[in-house]
From Swiss-Prot:
One of its GO terms (molecular function) is S-adenosylmethionine:tRNA ribosyltransferase-isomerase activity. It is found in: Cytoplasm. The keyword Membrane does not apply. Transfers and isomerizes the ribose moiety from AdoMet to the 7-aminomethyl group of 7-deazaguanine (preQ1-tRNA) to give epoxyqueuosine (oQ-tRNA). Keywords: Cytoplasm, Queuosine biosynthesis, S-adenosyl-L-methionine, Transferase. It comes from Nitrosospira multiformis (strain ATCC 25196 / NCIMB 11849 / C 71). This is S-adenosylmethionine:tRNA ribosyltransferase-isomerase.
């Protein structure tokens, strides 16, 4: 398919610059992927689509304060965005400066941290932090929250709370798994009382999630890699639910990618499916899984997501899940009805199973 198949015009005023006043006070567009039918709902209506024994899978990654400002050893200004912490003193990072720094050069960040540029690979730099404290501790102390590039306002103190899910537990992401931002403790408690099973995966969202696809043929796109983890407990929850007729709802494209990566991981190793028809394996690793129309989903029955950028890999993923023409119609409807788009925007529920 061509990149033009995933392009659309979005009025700038529909890009949400702030979250809803209260978590969960968002609209939700429901798409029945089988019939193509659309319903305008509220996020508070989510429980009406679920039943006891269903599994909701959340991404429990936590956004780190990954952005640092400083100067180079030449005196020029520099901005560093940590993409991934490699060990206690090294990180993979993007650097914005008037000229690309060379290996061996120094950066002085936040007035307190000396950093050595070790090497460059695939557009990122490997940096060594010359400090007795570890990278994570330094980021927490001196870093800034990395809001998405389409948020055209300064970071506010409230963003440290609202650009983080209430269940965030494992630091490592440079972007929030934004479908999860709609959930508050009240909604989670309500779902538990209903008998809906809560499960977690971890996928540390990288900055590549915001990058548009720049090739004409999407098959030529090189997908960014992200670290993920799927526990044995989550795998068992999914297998049990499927065996009993339950459905699996992935909260966000990152949860879906982690589950499908784990399923691909199992398939590569010819793992047995325990007779329940679900081939998925626990484990940790890196994934560059690129989900486009024609992909055969192995685990997920329904997807809760936000509205995505034109020409993005995430729009391709939801088009694969909900159907290309269905998603086009849904996005046209969302624009007409003035839904709020992107990270702080409204939700979309896409069902591929009976009853959702």
């Amino acid at each position: 398919m061509k990149i033009q198949d995933f392009d659309f015009d979005l009025p700038p005023e529909l890009i949400a610059q702030f979250p809803a006043e209260k978590r969960g006070n968002s609209r939700m567009l429901h798409l029945d992927a089988t019939s193509g039918a659309l319903q305008d709902r509220m996020f508070a209506d989510l429980p009406s689509y679920l039943r006891p024994g269903d599994v909701i899978v959340f991404n429990d990654t936590r956004v780190i304060k990954a952005r640092l400002y400083g100067v180079r050893d030449t005196g020029g200004r520099v901005e560093v965005l940590v993409e991934r912490v490699l060990d206690s003193h090294c990180a993979l990072a993007a650097i914005r400066a008037s000229h690309s720094p060379k290996p061996g050069s120094k950066l002085f960040l936040a007035g307190a941290i000396e950093v050595t540029v070790l090497s460059r690979e695939h557009g990122f730099y490997i940096l060594q932090f010359e400090h007795e404290s570890g990278v994570m501790e330094l980021l927490e102390r001196y870093g800034n929250l990395p809001l998405p590039p389409y948020i055209s306002r300064p970071v506010e103190k409230s963003d440290e709370l609202r650009y983080q899910t209430v269940y965030a537990a494992r630091p490592g992401a440079v972007a929030a798994p934004t479908a999860g931002l709609h959930f508050d403790e009240h909604m989670l408690g309500l779902l538990r009382k209903m008998g809906v099973v809560m499960a977690h995966v971890t996928l540390h969202v990288g900055s590549g999630t915001f990058q548009p696809v720049r090739v004409e043929n999407i098959a030529d796109h090189r997908m960014h890699s992200e670290v993920f983890y799927v526990s044995a407990e989550t795998v068992e929850c999914i297998r049990h639910a499927k065996a009993e007729g339950g459905r699996v709802l992935a909260v966000g494209t990152t949860s879906l990618r982690a589950l499908e990566a784990a399923a691909a991981f199992a398939g590569e190793r010819a793992e047995a499916d325990n007779g329940d028809g679900v081939r998925i394996k626990c484990g940790a690793g890196e994934t560059d899984i690129f989900i486009t129309p024609g992909y055969q989903f192995r685990v997920v029955d329904c997807l809760l997501t936000n509205f995505h950028l034109p020409r993005s890999t995430l729009l391709m993923l939801v088009s694969a899940f909900g159907g290309v023409e269905n998603i086009r119609c849904a996005y046209r409807h969302a624009i007409k009805e003035r839904y709020r788009f992107f990270s702080f925007g409204d939700a979309m529920l896409i069902g591929r199973a009976e009853g959702i």
